[in-house]
Protein backbone atom coordinates (compact mmCIF):
# COMPACT_ATOMS: atom_id res chain seq x y z
CA UNK A 1 0.00 0.00 0.00
CA UNK A 2 2.85 2.38 0.78
CA UNK A 3 4.25 1.89 -2.72
CA UNK A 4 0.84 2.56 -4.26
CA UNK A 5 0.37 5.69 -2.15
CA UNK A 6 3.80 6.94 -3.17
CA UNK A 7 3.00 6.34 -6.85
CA UNK A 8 -0.29 8.23 -6.51
CA UNK A 9 1.46 11.15 -4.80
CA UNK A 10 4.16 11.29 -7.47
CA UNK A 11 1.57 11.15 -10.25
CA UNK A 12 -0.56 13.87 -8.65
CA UNK A 13 2.51 16.05 -8.12
CA UNK A 14 3.58 15.50 -11.73
CA UNK A 15 0.14 16.40 -13.10
CA UNK A 16 -0.08 19.45 -10.83
CA UNK A 17 3.26 20.77 -12.06
CA UNK A 18 2.34 20.06 -15.68
CA UNK A 19 -1.06 21.68 -15.28
CA UNK A 20 0.12 24.73 -13.36
CA UNK A 21 3.37 25.52 -15.15
CA UNK A 22 2.58 24.46 -18.72
CA UNK A 23 -1.03 23.46 -19.38
CA UNK A 24 -2.87 26.52 -18.08
CA UNK A 25 -0.44 29.13 -19.47
CA UNK A 26 -0.44 27.46 -22.89
CA UNK A 27 -4.24 27.27 -22.93
CA UNK A 28 -4.39 31.05 -22.52
CA UNK A 29 -1.52 31.71 -24.91
CA UNK A 30 0.83 32.81 -22.13
CA UNK A 31 4.43 31.88 -21.35
CA UNK A 32 6.23 31.75 -18.01
CA UNK A 33 9.61 32.02 -19.72
CA UNK A 34 10.56 28.37 -19.22
CA UNK A 35 10.66 27.67 -22.97
CA UNK A 36 12.83 30.74 -23.57
CA UNK A 37 15.35 29.63 -20.93
CA UNK A 38 15.40 26.10 -22.37
CA UNK A 39 16.00 27.41 -25.90
CA UNK A 40 18.86 29.68 -24.77
CA UNK A 41 20.60 26.76 -23.04
CA UNK A 42 19.97 24.55 -26.07
CA UNK A 43 21.37 27.10 -28.53
CA UNK A 44 24.52 27.58 -26.43
CA UNK A 45 24.99 23.80 -26.14
CA UNK A 46 24.63 23.18 -29.88
CA UNK A 47 26.98 26.08 -30.68
CA UNK A 48 29.58 24.60 -28.33
CA UNK A 49 29.11 21.13 -29.88
CA UNK A 50 29.52 22.57 -33.38
CA UNK A 51 32.80 24.24 -32.40
CA UNK A 52 34.08 21.01 -30.85
CA UNK A 53 33.20 19.04 -33.99
CA UNK A 54 34.84 21.60 -36.27
CA UNK A 55 37.94 21.69 -34.07
CA UNK A 56 38.18 17.92 -33.73
CA UNK A 57 37.49 16.98 -37.33
CA UNK A 58 38.12 19.92 -39.68
CA UNK A 59 38.51 17.72 -42.75
CA UNK A 60 35.25 15.91 -42.11
CA UNK A 61 33.44 19.21 -41.58
CA UNK A 62 34.80 20.63 -44.81
CA UNK A 63 33.73 17.51 -46.66
CA UNK A 64 30.24 17.72 -45.22
CA UNK A 65 29.88 21.39 -46.11
CA UNK A 66 30.87 20.72 -49.69
CA UNK A 67 28.49 17.77 -49.92
CA UNK A 68 25.58 19.83 -48.65
CA UNK A 69 25.49 21.83 -51.85
CA UNK A 70 25.24 18.72 -54.03
CA UNK A 71 27.02 15.51 -54.87
CA UNK A 72 27.60 16.46 -58.49
CA UNK A 73 28.06 19.62 -60.50
CA UNK A 74 24.91 19.54 -62.56
CA UNK A 75 24.73 20.92 -66.10
CA UNK A 76 21.62 23.10 -66.17
CA UNK A 77 21.92 24.14 -69.82
CA UNK A 78 18.99 23.36 -72.15
CA UNK A 79 19.09 20.45 -74.58
CA UNK A 80 19.90 22.63 -77.60
CA UNK A 81 22.98 24.11 -75.92
CA UNK A 82 24.07 20.82 -74.39
CA UNK A 83 24.05 19.04 -77.73
CA UNK A 84 25.62 21.85 -79.73
CA UNK A 85 29.14 20.88 -78.68
CA UNK A 86 28.63 17.18 -79.37
CA UNK A 87 27.07 17.18 -82.80
CA UNK A 88 27.32 18.56 -86.27
CA UNK A 89 24.32 19.52 -88.31
CA UNK A 90 22.31 16.27 -88.22
CA UNK A 91 21.79 13.30 -85.95
CA UNK A 92 24.99 11.73 -84.72
CA UNK A 93 25.62 8.73 -82.54
CA UNK A 94 27.56 10.97 -80.15
CA UNK A 95 24.22 12.46 -79.03
CA UNK A 96 23.93 9.33 -76.88
CA UNK A 97 26.65 10.70 -74.60
CA UNK A 98 24.54 13.75 -73.71
CA UNK A 99 21.49 11.67 -72.78
CA UNK A 100 23.66 9.17 -70.88
CA UNK A 101 25.18 12.03 -68.87
CA UNK A 102 21.73 13.40 -68.05
CA UNK A 103 20.56 9.95 -67.01
CA UNK A 104 23.53 9.42 -64.72
CA UNK A 105 22.98 12.85 -63.14
CA UNK A 106 19.38 11.87 -62.37
CA UNK A 107 20.44 8.51 -60.91
CA UNK A 108 23.20 9.94 -58.71
CA UNK A 109 21.25 12.94 -57.42
CA UNK A 110 17.95 13.99 -58.91
CA UNK A 111 16.22 17.11 -57.65
CA UNK A 112 12.89 15.41 -56.89
CA UNK A 113 13.26 12.25 -54.79
CA UNK A 114 15.71 13.89 -52.38
CA UNK A 115 12.85 16.20 -51.35
CA UNK A 116 11.01 13.17 -49.94
CA UNK A 117 13.69 12.33 -47.35
CA UNK A 118 14.97 14.25 -44.36
CA UNK A 119 17.24 17.22 -44.98
CA UNK A 120 20.91 16.56 -44.27
CA UNK A 121 22.52 18.69 -41.57
CA UNK A 122 25.74 20.64 -41.97
CA UNK A 123 26.61 20.16 -38.29
CA UNK A 124 25.55 17.41 -35.91
CA UNK A 125 22.75 18.39 -33.51
CA UNK A 126 23.55 15.68 -30.90
CA UNK A 127 20.68 13.43 -31.99
CA UNK A 128 21.57 9.77 -32.61
CA UNK A 129 19.35 9.56 -35.71
CA UNK A 130 21.39 12.29 -37.45
CA UNK A 131 24.82 10.93 -36.48
CA UNK A 132 25.53 9.53 -39.95
CA UNK A 133 28.47 11.62 -41.09
CA UNK A 134 29.89 12.53 -37.67
CA UNK A 135 32.14 10.26 -35.61
CA UNK A 136 33.64 10.23 -32.11
CA UNK A 137 35.31 13.57 -31.32
CA UNK A 138 36.06 13.89 -27.60
CA UNK A 139 35.04 12.52 -24.18
CA UNK A 140 33.35 15.81 -23.24
CA UNK A 141 31.20 15.81 -26.36
CA UNK A 142 30.26 12.18 -25.72
CA UNK A 143 29.26 13.03 -22.14
CA UNK A 144 27.10 15.91 -23.37
CA UNK A 145 25.45 13.57 -25.87
CA UNK A 146 24.71 10.99 -23.12
CA UNK A 147 23.29 13.74 -20.90
CA UNK A 148 21.14 14.89 -23.81
CA UNK A 149 19.76 11.37 -24.31
CA UNK A 150 18.82 11.19 -20.62
CA UNK A 151 17.14 14.60 -20.70
CA UNK A 152 15.20 13.89 -23.88
CA UNK A 153 14.02 10.37 -23.04
CA UNK A 154 13.71 10.46 -19.25
CA UNK A 155 12.32 13.98 -18.74
CA UNK A 156 11.15 15.64 -21.95
CA UNK A 157 9.48 12.58 -23.50
CA UNK A 158 7.21 11.79 -20.50
CA UNK A 159 6.36 15.49 -20.20
CA UNK A 160 5.56 15.83 -23.89
CA UNK A 161 3.54 12.61 -24.04
CA UNK A 162 1.49 13.84 -21.08
CA UNK A 163 0.79 17.18 -22.76
CA UNK A 164 0.03 15.55 -26.12
CA UNK A 165 -2.37 13.07 -24.51
CA UNK A 166 -4.17 15.89 -22.69
CA UNK A 167 -4.29 18.10 -25.79
CA UNK A 168 -5.53 15.40 -28.18
CA UNK A 169 -8.04 14.05 -25.64
CA UNK A 170 -9.46 17.52 -24.99
CA UNK A 171 -9.67 18.15 -28.73
CA UNK A 172 -11.57 14.93 -29.42
CA UNK A 173 -13.89 15.29 -26.42
CA UNK A 174 -14.39 19.04 -26.85
CA UNK A 175 -15.20 18.95 -30.57
CA UNK A 176 -17.51 15.97 -30.08
CA UNK A 177 -19.48 17.80 -27.38
CA UNK A 178 -19.58 21.10 -29.28
CA UNK A 179 -20.75 19.20 -32.34
CA UNK A 180 -23.95 18.25 -30.52
CA UNK A 181 -25.04 21.88 -30.28
CA UNK A 182 -27.29 23.43 -32.94
CA UNK A 183 -25.66 25.78 -35.45
CA UNK A 184 -25.31 29.19 -33.84
CA UNK A 185 -22.77 31.88 -33.04
CA UNK A 186 -22.24 30.21 -29.63
CA UNK A 187 -21.31 26.92 -31.29
CA UNK A 188 -18.85 28.68 -33.60
CA UNK A 189 -17.27 30.52 -30.68
CA UNK A 190 -16.91 27.35 -28.60
CA UNK A 191 -15.50 25.47 -31.59
CA UNK A 192 -12.85 28.14 -32.16
CA UNK A 193 -12.02 28.16 -28.44
CA UNK A 194 -11.58 24.37 -28.32
CA UNK A 195 -9.45 24.29 -31.49
CA UNK A 196 -7.26 27.20 -30.41
CA UNK A 197 -6.72 25.95 -26.85
CA UNK A 198 -5.97 22.35 -27.78
CA UNK A 199 -3.61 23.32 -30.61
CA UNK A 200 -1.64 25.53 -28.23
CA UNK A 201 -1.33 22.66 -25.76
CA UNK A 202 -0.19 20.29 -28.51
CA UNK A 203 2.44 22.78 -29.71
CA UNK A 204 3.80 22.96 -26.16
CA UNK A 205 4.05 19.16 -26.21
CA UNK A 206 6.62 19.58 -29.00
CA UNK A 207 8.51 22.38 -27.23
CA UNK A 208 7.39 24.48 -30.16
CA UNK A 209 8.97 27.89 -30.63
CA UNK A 210 7.18 29.78 -33.39
CA UNK A 211 8.03 33.21 -34.74
CA UNK A 212 5.14 34.86 -36.60
CA UNK A 213 5.95 37.67 -39.03
CA UNK A 214 3.67 40.27 -40.66
CA UNK A 215 0.61 39.51 -38.55
CA UNK A 216 -1.28 42.28 -40.31
CA UNK A 217 -1.61 39.87 -43.26
CA UNK A 218 -3.21 37.05 -41.30
CA UNK A 219 -5.91 35.23 -43.34
CA UNK A 220 -9.35 36.78 -42.97
CA UNK A 221 -12.76 35.11 -42.90
CA UNK A 222 -14.05 34.13 -46.31
CA UNK A 223 -10.50 33.81 -47.67
CA UNK A 224 -8.25 30.90 -48.61
CA UNK A 225 -4.96 30.33 -46.81
CA UNK A 226 -2.38 28.35 -48.81
CA UNK A 227 0.97 27.22 -47.39
CA UNK A 228 3.87 24.91 -48.16
CA UNK A 229 3.49 21.50 -46.54
CA UNK A 230 6.07 19.70 -44.42
CA UNK A 231 4.14 17.84 -41.76
CA UNK A 232 0.73 17.45 -40.07
CA UNK A 233 2.02 19.80 -37.39
CA UNK A 234 1.81 22.60 -39.98
CA UNK A 235 -1.83 22.71 -38.96
CA UNK A 236 -0.92 23.10 -35.28
CA UNK A 237 1.62 25.81 -36.10
CA UNK A 238 -0.96 27.91 -37.95
CA UNK A 239 -3.95 27.07 -35.73
CA UNK A 240 -2.06 28.31 -32.67
CA UNK A 241 -2.35 31.84 -34.05
CA UNK A 242 -5.85 31.60 -35.54
CA UNK A 243 -8.64 29.19 -36.45
CA UNK A 244 -9.18 27.66 -39.88
CA UNK A 245 -11.58 25.39 -41.71
CA UNK A 246 -9.27 22.71 -43.06
CA UNK A 247 -9.23 20.77 -46.31
CA UNK A 248 -7.31 17.52 -46.54
CA UNK A 249 -6.98 13.86 -47.36
CA UNK A 250 -8.92 11.30 -45.31
CA UNK A 251 -6.62 9.34 -42.99
CA UNK A 252 -6.95 6.27 -40.83
CA UNK A 253 -5.62 5.50 -37.37
CA UNK A 254 -5.13 8.29 -34.85
CA UNK A 255 -5.31 10.97 -37.53
CA UNK A 256 -8.65 9.59 -38.70
CA UNK A 257 -10.07 9.69 -35.17
CA UNK A 258 -9.03 13.33 -34.80
CA UNK A 259 -10.47 14.23 -38.22
CA UNK A 260 -13.85 12.63 -37.49
CA UNK A 261 -14.08 14.46 -34.17
CA UNK A 262 -13.05 17.86 -35.56
CA UNK A 263 -15.54 17.83 -38.43
CA UNK A 264 -18.42 17.59 -35.95
CA UNK A 265 -17.70 21.06 -34.56
CA UNK A 266 -16.31 22.87 -37.60
CA UNK A 267 -17.01 22.61 -41.37
CA UNK A 268 -13.71 20.96 -42.27
CA UNK A 269 -13.61 19.15 -45.62
CA UNK A 270 -12.02 15.69 -45.72
CA UNK A 271 -11.91 13.82 -49.01
CA UNK A 272 -10.46 10.77 -50.73
CA UNK A 273 -8.04 11.98 -53.39
CA UNK A 274 -8.57 8.94 -55.62
CA UNK A 275 -12.34 9.49 -55.85
CA UNK A 276 -13.38 11.75 -58.73
CA UNK A 277 -16.77 12.45 -57.16
CA UNK A 278 -15.04 13.61 -53.99
CA UNK A 279 -13.07 16.20 -55.97
CA UNK A 280 -16.24 17.70 -57.46
CA UNK A 281 -17.88 17.72 -54.03
CA UNK A 282 -14.86 19.47 -52.51
CA UNK A 283 -14.91 22.16 -55.21
CA UNK A 284 -18.60 22.78 -54.60
CA UNK A 285 -18.12 22.93 -50.82
CA UNK A 286 -15.22 25.36 -51.14
CA UNK A 287 -17.15 27.72 -53.41
CA UNK A 288 -20.05 27.75 -50.96
CA UNK A 289 -17.65 28.34 -48.06
CA UNK A 290 -15.83 31.35 -49.49
CA UNK A 291 -19.14 32.90 -50.54
CA UNK A 292 -19.95 33.33 -46.83
CA UNK A 293 -17.66 36.05 -45.44
CA UNK A 294 -18.58 35.07 -41.88
CA UNK A 295 -16.97 31.64 -42.11
CA UNK A 296 -13.41 30.83 -41.08
CA UNK A 297 -10.67 31.05 -43.70
CA UNK A 298 -9.96 27.77 -45.47
CA UNK A 299 -6.54 26.20 -44.94
CA UNK A 300 -5.19 24.31 -47.97
CA UNK A 301 -1.81 22.74 -48.73
CA UNK A 302 -1.78 22.76 -52.56
CA UNK A 303 1.30 20.52 -52.85
CA UNK A 304 -0.89 17.62 -51.73
CA UNK A 305 1.93 15.83 -49.87
CA UNK A 306 4.66 16.51 -47.34
CA UNK A 307 7.96 17.90 -48.67
CA UNK A 308 11.14 18.10 -46.56
CA UNK A 309 11.02 21.90 -46.19
CA UNK A 310 13.91 22.56 -48.56
CA UNK A 311 11.69 23.33 -51.54
CA UNK A 312 8.19 24.08 -52.78
CA UNK A 313 6.81 21.72 -55.41
CA UNK A 314 3.94 22.08 -57.86
CA UNK A 315 0.73 23.61 -56.51
CA UNK A 316 -2.42 21.81 -57.67
CA UNK A 317 -4.58 24.23 -59.63
CA UNK A 318 -7.88 23.18 -58.00
CA UNK A 319 -7.41 25.52 -55.05
CA UNK A 320 -6.97 28.47 -57.41
CA UNK A 321 -9.97 27.82 -59.67
CA UNK A 322 -12.68 28.56 -57.15
CA UNK A 323 -12.01 32.30 -56.91
CA UNK A 324 -11.73 34.29 -53.72
CA UNK A 325 -8.77 35.93 -52.05
CA UNK A 326 -5.62 33.87 -51.51
CA UNK A 327 -3.56 34.48 -48.36
CA UNK A 328 -0.11 32.91 -48.92
CA UNK A 329 1.83 31.69 -45.89
CA UNK A 330 5.45 30.50 -45.87
CA UNK A 331 6.54 28.04 -43.15
CA UNK A 332 10.24 27.37 -42.58
CA UNK A 333 11.48 24.96 -39.88
CA UNK A 334 14.95 25.00 -38.34
CA UNK A 335 16.26 21.42 -38.76
CA UNK A 336 19.06 22.00 -36.25
CA UNK A 337 16.66 21.49 -33.33
CA UNK A 338 14.52 18.73 -34.80
CA UNK A 339 13.32 17.33 -38.11
CA UNK A 340 9.68 18.29 -38.67
CA UNK A 341 9.35 16.44 -41.99
CA UNK A 342 6.91 13.51 -42.01
CA UNK A 343 8.02 10.71 -44.31
CA UNK A 344 4.61 9.03 -44.38
CA UNK A 345 5.88 6.18 -46.55
CA UNK A 346 8.33 5.24 -43.78
CA UNK A 347 6.64 6.20 -40.50
CA UNK A 348 3.04 6.11 -39.32
CA UNK A 349 1.70 9.07 -37.36
CA UNK A 350 2.43 7.67 -33.89
CA UNK A 351 6.03 6.76 -34.82
CA UNK A 352 6.50 10.19 -36.35
CA UNK A 353 5.18 11.93 -33.23
CA UNK A 354 7.54 9.91 -31.03
CA UNK A 355 10.46 10.95 -33.24
CA UNK A 356 9.75 14.65 -32.94
CA UNK A 357 8.91 14.32 -29.23
CA UNK A 358 12.39 12.91 -28.65
CA UNK A 359 13.98 15.77 -30.59
CA UNK A 360 15.23 18.92 -28.91
CA UNK A 361 12.41 21.20 -30.05
CA UNK A 362 10.39 22.32 -33.06
CA UNK A 363 11.49 25.80 -34.10
CA UNK A 364 9.99 27.54 -37.10
CA UNK A 365 9.21 30.88 -38.72
CA UNK A 366 5.83 31.71 -40.22
CA UNK A 367 5.50 34.56 -42.69
CA UNK A 368 2.04 35.90 -43.46
CA UNK A 369 2.09 37.49 -46.90
CA UNK A 370 -0.07 40.14 -48.60
CA UNK A 371 -3.29 38.73 -50.07
CA UNK A 372 -3.25 37.82 -53.75
CA UNK A 373 -6.06 37.60 -56.31
CA UNK A 374 -6.25 36.21 -59.80
CA UNK A 375 -5.29 38.79 -62.39
CA UNK A 376 -7.17 39.46 -65.59
CA UNK A 377 -6.21 36.98 -68.31
CA UNK A 378 -4.42 34.73 -65.82
CA UNK A 379 -5.46 31.08 -65.69
CA UNK A 380 -5.47 28.92 -62.56
CA UNK A 381 -2.09 27.31 -63.32
CA UNK A 382 -0.37 30.66 -63.78
CA UNK A 383 -1.97 31.99 -60.60
CA UNK A 384 -0.86 28.90 -58.66
CA UNK A 385 2.71 29.29 -59.94
CA UNK A 386 2.76 32.96 -58.98
CA UNK A 387 1.65 32.18 -55.43
CA UNK A 388 4.13 29.29 -55.21
CA UNK A 389 6.99 31.55 -56.31
CA UNK A 390 6.09 34.15 -53.70
CA UNK A 391 6.07 31.52 -50.92
CA UNK A 392 9.39 30.05 -52.09
CA UNK A 393 11.10 33.45 -52.13
CA UNK A 394 9.75 34.45 -48.71
CA UNK A 395 10.65 31.15 -47.04
CA UNK A 396 14.05 30.81 -48.71
CA UNK A 397 12.95 27.57 -50.39
CA UNK A 398 13.86 26.11 -53.77
CA UNK A 399 11.06 26.35 -56.32
CA UNK A 400 10.49 23.15 -58.30
CA UNK A 401 7.99 22.54 -61.13
CA UNK A 402 7.56 18.85 -60.31
CA UNK A 403 4.40 17.25 -58.92
CA UNK A 404 4.67 16.06 -55.32
CA UNK A 405 2.60 13.06 -56.41
CA UNK A 406 5.87 11.58 -57.74
CA UNK A 407 6.49 10.64 -54.11
CA UNK A 408 4.27 7.58 -54.63
CA UNK A 409 3.52 7.46 -58.37
CA UNK A 410 5.70 6.67 -61.37
CA UNK A 411 6.79 9.38 -63.76
CA UNK A 412 4.14 9.93 -66.42
CA UNK A 413 5.01 8.90 -69.97
CA UNK A 414 4.14 12.42 -71.10
CA UNK A 415 7.33 13.73 -69.45
CA UNK A 416 9.44 11.29 -71.47
CA UNK A 417 7.49 12.02 -74.64
CA UNK A 418 8.05 15.75 -74.17
CA UNK A 419 11.82 15.26 -74.18
CA UNK A 420 11.56 13.02 -77.23
CA UNK A 421 9.49 15.63 -79.05
CA UNK A 422 12.00 18.37 -78.23
CA UNK A 423 14.83 16.24 -79.59
CA UNK A 424 12.82 15.39 -82.72
CA UNK A 425 12.16 19.07 -83.35
CA UNK A 426 15.89 19.74 -83.11
CA UNK A 427 16.64 17.01 -85.66
CA UNK A 428 13.95 18.21 -88.06
CA UNK A 429 14.94 21.83 -87.61
CA UNK A 430 18.62 21.14 -88.25
CA UNK A 431 17.93 18.71 -91.06
CA UNK A 432 15.50 20.74 -93.15
CA UNK A 433 17.99 23.46 -94.15
CA UNK A 434 20.37 20.78 -95.40
CA UNK A 435 17.63 19.23 -97.48
CA UNK A 436 16.85 22.62 -98.95
CA UNK A 437 20.47 23.11 -99.97
CA UNK A 438 20.57 19.65 -101.55
Curated annotation (Swiss-Prot):
Function: Converts glycerol-3-phosphate to 1-acyl-sn-glycerol-3-phosphate (lysophosphatidic acid or LPA) by incorporating an acyl moiety at the sn-1 position of the glycerol backbone. Also converts LPA into 1,2-diacyl-sn-glycerol-3-phosphate (phosphatidic acid or PA) by incorporating an acyl moiety at the sn-2 position of the glycerol backbone. Protects cells against lipotoxicity.
Gene Ontology MF annotations: 1-acylglycerol-3-phosphate O-acyltransferase activity; glycerol-3-phosphate O-acyltransferase activity
GO cellular component assignments: endoplasmic reticulum; endoplasmic reticulum membrane
UniProt enzyme class: transferase
Catalytic activity of the protein: sn-glycerol 3-phosphate + an acyl-CoA = a 1-acyl-sn-glycero-3-phosphate + CoA; a 1-acyl-sn-glycero-3-phosphate + an acyl-CoA = a 1,2-diacyl-sn-glycero-3-phosphate + CoA; dodecanoyl-CoA + sn-glycerol 3-phosphate = 1-dodecanoyl-sn-glycerol 3-phosphate + CoA; sn-glycerol 3-phosphate + hexadecanoyl-CoA = 1-hexadecanoyl-sn-glycero-3-phosphate + CoA
Lineage top rank: taxon: Eukaryota
Protein localization: Endoplasmic reticulum membrane
Keyword Membrane in annotation: yes
Family annotation (Pfam families): Acyltransferase
Comment, domains: The HXXXXD motif is essential for acyltransferase activity and may constitute the binding site for the phosphate moiety of the glycerol-3-phosphate.
Species: Mus musculus
GO biological process, any: CDP-diacylglycerol biosynthetic process
Protein keywords: Acyltransferase, Endoplasmic reticulum, Lipid biosynthesis, Lipid metabolism, Membrane, Phospholipid biosynthesis, Phospholipid metabolism, Phosphoprotein, Transferase, Transmembrane, Transmembrane helix
Protein name: Glycerol-3-phosphate acyltransferase 3
Positions of transmembrane segments: 14-34, 137-157, 161-181
Sites of Phosphoserine modification: 68, 77
Amino acid sequence: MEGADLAVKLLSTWLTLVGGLILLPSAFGLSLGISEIYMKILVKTLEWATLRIQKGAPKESALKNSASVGIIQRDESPMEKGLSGLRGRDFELSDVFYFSKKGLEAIVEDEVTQRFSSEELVSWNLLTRTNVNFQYISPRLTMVWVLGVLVRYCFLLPLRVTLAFIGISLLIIGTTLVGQLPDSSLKNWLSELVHLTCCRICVRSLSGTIHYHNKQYRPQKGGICVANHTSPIDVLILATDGCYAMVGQVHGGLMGIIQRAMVKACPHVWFERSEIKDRHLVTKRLKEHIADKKKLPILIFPEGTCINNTSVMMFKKGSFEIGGTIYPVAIKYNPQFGDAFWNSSKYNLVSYLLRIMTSWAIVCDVWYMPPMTREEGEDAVQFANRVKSAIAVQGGLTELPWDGGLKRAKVKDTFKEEQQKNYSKMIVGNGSPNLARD
